[in-house]
């Protein structure tokens, strides 16, 4: 008998950890709902010959995009092989689903919100549990962790990735709308108390297949995240099941962090590091030589609005320091000096990593920072990770994942890295670094903007520009951080969070809603693109709009929030009909053809 023991399941591993390959055992073998449970009773003898170990996987290994639809009397599971594009449609057939699972259980199952919903419903259904009952309980429960324990669905291993974990705040239907693909919602009532008709089953299959195709498109947009997680798993000998973890939990695991109670020094005063020099009285008083207060949410916070004698205002808060000349335009060369990975390097250089990381693993974060910088400037196209060759850029992006996730995870209450004081001190120290930097520039330049990790300014003269660079470079060396210098030739600025800046080589930097979330949020895109092209290229916005023949550029994507019960559309004559939660809307010139969308709450 060949039995697979899942080492990542502590309960199983404790029973098998002292058993050697080749041992002859007396076992207790039970079958439940088509699955075997093997419990070792005692060892009969040690084996002389090591059993045959297959050189190839005994099951199929591929990437499967999938989605499920669960009704009271029907269940639908649809899978699509990413490489062969083959569909697998399993409708009301538990035995067929079990065969499929056993054949593909070593494959990667990729869905949208599958970590909390689809995976657990499918696992429970494979074990013979009521799929509808599990579905309703997961959807309606306020304590999903308790639900998962109650159904014990993790007994059936499932490997994969949840695209919802990096969804940029959008639902799958919204992503589908942005991509210009079908967003039609199902017309079949999930709570009907009867089996589906053949026609309803066909509609349900079509709806589900469409969601799988949308998941595939989103996967292709986000494949870098899978590669990043796989890189980290390879570097730290992690199990492939860890790919399903959130970035924050994955980071906590590789750093060996375990949850601790909040320490009693939470509000203790901040002692200014000897490498920093703060002369601005108001800022020094806000951060130094007193205990900190907790805000109404029980979190540490400093709130300060500081305006200097030149009228330049900077706002200090839990999100960093921000300042900008409002409604400002500048045509002409100017520098933006920004810190390389300010928070990650501040944590390392100022000893502000989470105190939940054990001493024997605390070096890992600094090692990753160094590895990333070495790889970035190595000039090598390929990196070797434990005998596996990967493109260097893939390794760099993989290392960025824990480096950039660590700060946020330190403030996540249920994460192993949770250390609210040190998270606050990272932010506060970063703001003091920015203040020290501001003081070195002040008097020698006019400030354009200040954000979390950068100051943009116009030097008063070439001599002042040189003096600023010398002072800033000396300061950067003193605190052990890297300070970059990017040049720009023009900027159009609404505020610090909304601006368009152009570099000498013509590369455009867009910040804020006008940038359509990095080009992902294709809603009212024609307005944003016409505006950017008018400013940057001098293109007449009317010509730009009239020359555009891509319908998707004109779409307006709307979504009814969860606080509303339903969406209705009202035509020009006042007639109302139900609309979808997510809708694709277009402007029309003829008002008689127009409809109005309304979100309703039942009172």
State what each model feature region is:
Residues 29, 68, 113-114, 163, ...:
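Residues immediately flanking
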Residues 79, 83-174, 207:
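Conserved DEDDh/DEDDy metal-dependent 3′-5′ exonuclease domain
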Residues 7, 39-47, 52-58, 69, ...:
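Conserved "right-hand" nucleotidyltransferase catalytic core of DNA-directed polymerases
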Residues 11-16, 22, 27, 31-61:
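N-terminal accessory regions of nucleic-acid-interacting proteins
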Residues 167-172, 180-182, 187-199, 310-436, ...:
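Helical catalytic core of nucleic-acid polymerases
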Residues 74-78, 119-126, 345-348, 458-461, ...:
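A short acidic (Asp/Glu
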Residues 57-80, 343:
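Gly/Thr-rich phosphate-binding beta-strand-loop-beta motif of the actin/hexokinase/Hsp70
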Residues 396, 431, 435, 465-601:
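C-terminal, non-catalytic extensions of nucleic-acid polymerases
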């Amino acid at each position: 008998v060949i039995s697979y023991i899942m080492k990542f399941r502590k309960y199983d591993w404790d029973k098998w950890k002292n058993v050697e390959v080749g041992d002859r055992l007396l076992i207790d073998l039970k079958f439940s709902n088509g699955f075997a449970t093997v419990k070792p009773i005692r060892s009969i003898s040690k084996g002389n010959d090591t059993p045959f170990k297959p050189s190839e996987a005994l099951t199929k290994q591929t990437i499967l995009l999938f989605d499920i639809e669960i009704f009271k009397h029907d269940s639908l599971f649809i899978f699509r092989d990413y490489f062969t594009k083959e569909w697998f449609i399993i409708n009301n057939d538990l035995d067929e689903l079990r065969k499929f699972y056993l054949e593909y259980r070593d494959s990667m199952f990729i869905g949208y919100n599958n970590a909390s919903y689809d995976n657990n419903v499918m696992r429970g259904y494979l074990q013979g549990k009521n799929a509808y009952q599990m579905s309703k309980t997961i959807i309606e429960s306020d304590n999903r962790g308790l639900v998962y324990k109650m159904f014990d669905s993790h007994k059936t291993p499932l490997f994969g990735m949840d695209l919802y974990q990096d969804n940029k705040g959008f639902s799958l239907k919204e992503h589908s709308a942005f991509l210009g693909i079908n967003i039609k919602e199902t017309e079949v009532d999930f709570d009907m108390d009867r089996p589906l008709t053949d026609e309803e089953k066909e509609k349900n299959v079509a709806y589900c297949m469409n969601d799988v195709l949308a998941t595939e498109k989103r996967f292709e947009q986000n494949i870098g995240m899978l590669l990043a997680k796989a890189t980290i798993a390879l570097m730290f000998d992690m199990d492939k099941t860890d790919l399903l973890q959130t970035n924050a939990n994955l980071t906590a695991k590789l750093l060996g962090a375990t949850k601790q109670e909040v320490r009693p020094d939470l509000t203790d005063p901040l002692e200014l590091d000897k490498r920093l020099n703060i002369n601005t009285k108001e800022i020094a008083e806000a951060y130094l030589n007193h205990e900190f207060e907790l805000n109404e949410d029980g979190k540490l916070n400093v709130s300060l609005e500081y305006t200097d004698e030149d009228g330049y205002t900077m706002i200090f808060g839990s999100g960093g320091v921000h300042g900008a000349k409002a409604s400002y335009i500048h045509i002409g060369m100017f520098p933006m000096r920004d810190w390389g990975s300010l928070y990650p390097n501040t944590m390392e250089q100022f000893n502000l990593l989470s105190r939940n990381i054990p001493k024997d693993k605390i070096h890992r974060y600094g090692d990753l920072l160094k590895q990333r910088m070495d790889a970035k400037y190595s000039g090598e196209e390929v990196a070797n990770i434990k005998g596996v060759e990967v493109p260097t850029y893939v390794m760099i992006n993989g290392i960025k994942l824990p480096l950039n996730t660590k700060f946020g995870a330190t403030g996540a209450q249920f994460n192993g890295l949770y250390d609210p004081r040190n998270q606050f001190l990272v932010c506060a120290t970063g703001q003091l670094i920015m203040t020290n930097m501001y003081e070195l520039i002040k008097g020698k330049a006019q400030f354009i903007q200040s954000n979390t990790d950068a100051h943009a300014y116009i030097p008063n003269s070439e001599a002042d520009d040189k003096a600023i660079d010398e002072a800033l470079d000396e300061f950067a060396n003193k605190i052990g951080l890297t300070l970059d210098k990017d040049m720009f030739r023009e900027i159009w600025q609404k505020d610090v969070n909304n601006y368009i800046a152009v570099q000498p080589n013509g590369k455009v930097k867009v910040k804020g809603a006008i940038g359509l979330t990095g080009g992902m949020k294709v809603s009212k895109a024609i307005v944003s693109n016409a505006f950017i092209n008018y400013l940057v290229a001098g293109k007449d916005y009317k010509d730009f709009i009239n020359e555009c023949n891509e319908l998707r550029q004109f779409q307006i994507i709307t979504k009814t929030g969860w606080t509303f019960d339903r969406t209705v559309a009202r035509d020009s004559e006042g007639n109302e009909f139900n609309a979808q939660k997510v809708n694709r809307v277009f402007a029309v010139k003829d008002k008689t053809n127009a409809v109005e969308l309304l979100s309703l709450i039942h009172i």
